[in-house]
Amino acid sequence: DRETLLQKEKDYTVARQRIELSLESFYRSSSSLVFQLNKRHITRHMSIFRCIDRRFETGEIFIKWDEAADDQWLLLIYIKNNSPDEGIVIEDKTDPEKNSSHDFRANEIFKASDFMVDSLTQLIARERAKKD
């Protein structure tokens, strides 16, 4: 009936908002990181990073090289098992030798941010070393 349908829609909307809100600080952090790295550390001969916000479509945020396809991301951020209570996962493909996955609680944004900074700065260092 109509009442059940409205309740389901309301429940779905509340669940979506919880997911989007729990990823908000991670999006702001990764977006800021990409801006700073592009501004200060990317050389003229390197591609820039892009932070793609898909929180509303797929519940994901990812960082990739500008010219790379979306599925060629470097860092992927999403909610573990689509449940904000279970935490946030950051998958890391910045090192071609070793892909890794790291779990963070929603309140560990600074720890997660440090992790993303380390991964991307090491990637930039490897790219620069290749050019020399």
Segments (PLM) and residue ranges:
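Intrinsically disordered, low-complexity regulatory segments enriched in Ser/Thr/Pro
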Residues: 67-110
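Ampiphathic alpha-helical segments that act as solvent-exposed interaction surfaces
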Residues: 94-132
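Amphipathic, interaction-prone secondary-structure segments
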Residues: 43-81
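Context-gated lysine
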Residues: 8-10, 39, 64, 80, ...
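Generic hydrophobic, helix-prone segments enriched in Leu/Val/Ile
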Residues: 10, 19-22, 29, 77, ...
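Coiled-coil termination/hinge junctions
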Residues: 19-55
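Charge-rich, low-complexity alpha-helical coiled-coil segments
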Residues: 1-21
